[in-house]
Structure formats: C-alpha cells, structure tokens
C-alpha cells in the first residue's frame, strides 16, 4: 500500500521547517492538501506506508513533551522511517557537549532529519546551519511552533471548510507563547483576521505586534472581542517562562479571561474552541467547554499526526 497519488504532485524545495514566516499561501495549501491524503492513510486498517523506508529521523527533545513528541514518532513510523528518540538526559549533553557537536554526531550516525524542541529560541536555526539534512522546529523557547500552527489550520479547514475571512481570537499568555506567534503567521497568511486578547502584562507592547501585523486587533476585553468569533484559541499560562508579578492571581485571571460556556455563547454558533495543550482546566478554560461539541481539542491532537506525516513526506524528497 502506498501514499495516495495526489499527495505526490509536488515536493517542497525547502530543506527545513523553522517557522511559517517565510511560507507562502501556496506552500501552506499544499501541506494541508497532503495532510488530507495522510489522514486517509491513518484511516486504513494498516496505518503504514513504505514512503520513508530507509530514512532515519531523530526526535531531539530538550524540553518535556507528550503530544508533539509522540505525534512525530507516530508520523515517522507510519511512513516506515527509522525513528530514534533523543533526550538530553543521559546523553553527552549532560557532560557539556554543545548543541553543534551533538548535531554533528547525529549526522555522522546517519540521521536524515532532525525534529527539535528546545527551551532556547533559535536553537533549531543553529542546528540547521550545521546539519546537511532537514531540521523541523518542534518548538523553540518563546519563538515558534510551526507544526502546531499547521495542524491548527488543518483542523479549522477540516471543520469549517475554509480559513479565509474567518475571525480568530487568540486568548491568554501571548507574551510567552510560541504557538501564538506561529498561528499569527499561519492564519493571517491564509486570509483570516486575528485578534489577540490578554492582560497587558501578558501581551507586551502593541507596537511590537503591529510592526509585523499592522491589521492585528489587540485588546484586553474578552467579552467584547469574542462576539461573532469563528475560532477561539485559548493558551496555557506558561508559569515556567514567567517573571514574578505578571498576574495578581490565577483566580483573577480566570475571572476575566477563562473560556466559559457563557462566553462561547457570544461567539458564532459554529465557533470552534481550540487549545494547543497541555490544559489548565478551570484556569484558562472550563472543563465543560473543553469537552463540549464546539471543542476540537482532541481533533487537534489527532490531526497533528497527519500534518506531521505530510511535512516529513514533503521534506524527504522521496
């Protein structure tokens, strides 16, 4: 069994996926179309094709991860690649080996692709300078998480049939969120209008955002901006990246910015509720909303495998 023929109409000429800032609308469209084919593969009785047989993918996760790491592992194995999971703990990194030397070592061992998550913004970019194969950014510091944005785009298009013209509201810890930044690139590139909603302390200077996205709406009034929204994406409070004093209390934050059933009722009837995970239920989203008919949180997780299969496939040049 093989990948459906329509998935192979075009290969990406790019070697790396570091963020969506330099992706054209056409490139994103083609990835989403390929993901449709990969989702069809995952719906078969045997969820595997031989497309990347003989290729070696190393998942380098320097930060803890459940969804992204397992999703990439499943994606690589569904394409018949050899998948190796690397963690800093127990490796030569603990002995002081640099990222560059680690990348060179993995290259010497025959790795064809590196999937990297790192706490330092820019780490995958550094790796890409020294690795002869492909590097995929699986999240770097506050900077970017391009595959999360692609799976979010895919989920919205699968549910609503389009992205162009939609009103997307991103709520929560914008300041520390790599997901917010990559989704800004993705949704605006695909023609959606985006609103950022957060306390001033969790969004930073408006001029920073407007310099890149001049049409962006920025507000701290969730009850107002959520009206007629097609998509509500709420983000986790990233306490591990926060400085002290950014929030008075979690209770105060939840009062003004939690996604509740009452607030969702203000949005469009077909509005989708999204969360990249992991969730702090009762803080940024109420449990009944997370499991409601409008929630696509589990679909996001499931769609991540198909989208990451599409990226691995297109970058491989097979």
UniProtKB/Swiss-Prot annotation:
Residues reported in the UniProt entry to bind L-aspartate: 95, 178, 236
Keyword Transferase on entry: yes
Gene3D superfamilies: Aspartate/ornithine carbamoyltransferase
GO molecular function: amino acid binding; aspartate carbamoyltransferase activity
Lineage top rank: taxon: Bacteria
Amino-acid positions noted as binding carbamoyl phosphate in the UniProt annotation, renumbered to this chain: 67-68, 117, 145, 148, 277-278
Top-level EC class: transferase
EC number(s) reported in the record: 2.1.3.2
GO-annotated cellular components: cytosol
InterPro entries: Asp/Orn_carbamoyltranf_P-bd (IPR006132), Asp/Orn_carbamoylTrfase (IPR006130), Asp/Orn_carbamoylTrfase_sf (IPR036901), Asp_carbamoyltransf (IPR002082), Asp_carbamoyltransf_Asp/Orn-bd (IPR006131)
Subunit note: Heterododecamer (2C3:3R2) of six catalytic PyrB chains organized as two trimers (C3), and six regulatory PyrI chains organized as three dimers (R2).
HAMAP family registered for this protein in UniProt: Asp_carb_tr
Membership in a protein family: Belongs to the aspartate/ornithine carbamoyltransferase superfamily. ATCase family.
Protein name (database record): Aspartate carbamoyltransferase catalytic subunit
Organism (species): Roseiflexus sp. (strain RS-1)
Species lineage: Bacteria, Bacillati, Chloroflexota, Chloroflexia, Chloroflexales
Gene field: pyrB
